[in-house]
Regions:
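Immediate post-signal peptide segment of exported/extracytoplasmic ligand-binding proteins
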Residues: 19-26, 117
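Acidic, Gly/Pro-rich loop/turn segments at junctions of secondary structure
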Residues: 49, 58-152
Length: 257
């Protein structure tokens, strides 16, 4: 009887430890625009599955911040370069050149990058990615030069300006404008010209990776974002041609830098 009781006590202890491994706080860094409009509904789904895990939302931290332990999980634009990180693709960011129908009615549709000199351009200059300097069509590359430029670190402020017929942008993230495209309030410009898509990643430090709650959230979040961003592309493809996705088969691997 005594060995049986010891085995039962050990089982209870293991189950308690397992439950505690899925309790606690995770500090998540996300791009500010995505955090403002999309993130909370996604996290509600996760917390329905893991109610004992609390997610703390931070904005715009870099891979060096992640490496320093300022957050536990971060979304990064482009392949992480610093050592000591654990990463998985969350899918690609697609960037589209757009303007409002009202703006185009007043100022005309730019068809090629050189015609941007006749337009007011809104330029994203925030911390999430580098400023767009060129556009690509096939093997051709052309510089982006506006007649007038307004720079902003706030992608949502740029979206608002576009919707208010105030100018054009050549690199609006699809995630921020998919509903506007479907409603026709924003219209694709510069047919065939794009800022090339950028693969994005979920990353954590190797130290945080040892926490089970981080591992569980990390993989759930990466796959949820892959599905979400693929759904945006599927919706948008009905109204605009998108760049080919050559990386689609390579998004299931967790790797270390």
């Amino acid at each position: 009887m005594e060995p049986l009781l010891r085995a039962h006590a050990s089982l209870i202890s293991d189950l308690t430890s397992e439950a505690r491994a899925l309790e606690g706080n995770i500090r998540l860094s996300s791009a500010p625009g995505f955090a403002s409009r999309r993130l909370t509904s996604l996290l509600q789904r996760f917390q329905a599955e893991q109610p004992a895990i609390t997610i703390e939302i931070l904005s715009g931290l870099s891979e060096s911040d992640l490496q320093k332990g300022l957050c536990d999980v971060a979304t990064l634009t482009g392949l992480p370069a610093l050592p000591g990180l654990v990463c998985m693709s969350r899918g690609r960011n697609v960037y589209l050149p757009v303007a409002s129908a009202g703006y185009l009615k007043k100022h005309g549709m730019p068809l090629t990058p050189d015609q941007l000199r006749a337009h007011t351009g809104y330029v994203y200059a925030g911390p999430v990615r580098h400023e767009t300097k060129v556009l690509v069509r096939g093997d051709r590359t052309e510089p982006v030069v506006f007649g007038q430029s307004i720079r902003s670190t706030d992608i949502l402020a740029i979206r608002t300006a576009l919707l208010n017929d105030m100018g054009v942008a050549v690199d609006m993230p699809l995630v921020q404008i998919v509903e506007d495209l479907l409603a026709g309030t924003l219209v694709p410009i510069l047919p065939g010209w794009f800022r090339p898509p950028v693969e994005c990643y979920i990353a954590t430090s190797r130290t945080a990776w040892h926490l089970k709650r981080v591992r569980v959230f990390f993989e759930w979040y990466a796959r949820a974002l892959q599905a979400l961003f693929a759904s945006y592309e599927a919706q948008a493809s009905a109204v605009v041609g998108l760049p080919r996705d050559d990386e689609a088969a390579e998004r299931s691997t967790i790797f270390r830098t």
